[in-house]
Amino acid sequence: MIFLMREFVMVEVTKINGVKVLINPDLLELVEETPDTVLTFTTGRKIIVKESRQEVKNLVKSYRKDIFAN
């Protein structure tokens, strides 16, 4: 799911503990499946999410389409 938040868009993912969080995909540097999906940001922060690598990829692609369509 994609949200408009104060002039920028964020993507919703679910942390491994079930908590839904919004991430800025522009800061996403690396998506790994180890087998858990680990998101690494340009800040060095990492989070483990329930979504698969492919699901994260699709969310980011959808985000980019929305950004460039407007």
Regions found by a protein language model. Give the residues of each.
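Eukaryotic intrinsically disordered, low-complexity regulatory linkers and tails enriched in Ser/Thr/Pro
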Residues: M1-L22, D26-N70
